[in-house]
Design a protein with these regions (language model features):
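OB-fold and OB-like single-stranded nucleic-acid-recognition modules
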Residues: 2-191
Length: 191
């Protein structure tokens, strides 16, 4: 459950405590078929989420046809979702591409988006799986690139790239491969 006013995520299912996402935004694309598992179809749809800077992040959602009518035009609808941030490797010609999306577990349609609500939150509890890369941007901002492995059921893991800024970047640059980390933040669009 999510307390939107307070911006806190509460999930009763213990299995999902190590990977929690809540997003509030506007649907900006049609549903695209992704795959089917045991007769259940899964579809991709994009949601625009506003940052405090008024820049929009476009976040892909993976959603079951059992949660929403994928044949209906939902573009322009405001939606609140909770779920997990998932990854998989898509094999493209001669290389693999890491595909990231929010796997939707629950959703709610909203009449309007309250600007006071924290509209984009993620919590990950996992393990650093490669050496952090610390660097400075051309504008002098400190950042550290991390790759976090987050375990899920059936022996699977999601590999989530993360960026830390400022003093958090300096702190994260000292993380050891295999070390346990907990991260709170937001999901940003990939360029």
């Amino acid at each position: 459950m999510y307390d939107r006013k307070e911006g806190r995520i509460f999930m009763a299912d213990k299995m999902f405590e190590n990977n929690q996402v809540s997003i509030v935004g506007e649907i900006v694309s049609d549903f695209r078929f992704s795959h089917e598992v045991y007769g259940e179809g899964f579809y991709m749809v994009d949601v625009a989420v506003n940052r405090l800077s008024n820049y929009m992040d476009y976040i892909p959602l993976m959603i079951s046809e059992r949660l929403i009518d994928v044949n209906e035009d939902m573009v322009g609808q405001n939606i609140y979702v909770t779920g997990q941030f998932r990854s998989f490797n898509r094999h493209e010609e001669k290389k693999n591409r890491l595909v990231l999306s929010v796997f939707v577990r629950e959703l709610e349609f909203l009449d309007e988006i309250d600007d006071e609500v924290k509209s984009n939150q993620i919590f990950l509890d996992g393990y650093e799986c490669k050496e952090p890369i610390y660097r400075k941007t051309p504008l002098g901002r400190e950042i550290a690139d991390l790759l976090i492995a987050v375990n899920r059921s059936y022996g699977k893991s999601d590999y989530i790239p993360c960026i830390c800024w400022g003093r958090n970047a300096r702190f994260a640059s000292g993380f050891d491969v295999g070390g346990h980390v907990q991260i709170w933040g937001r999901i940003q669009s990939r360029e």
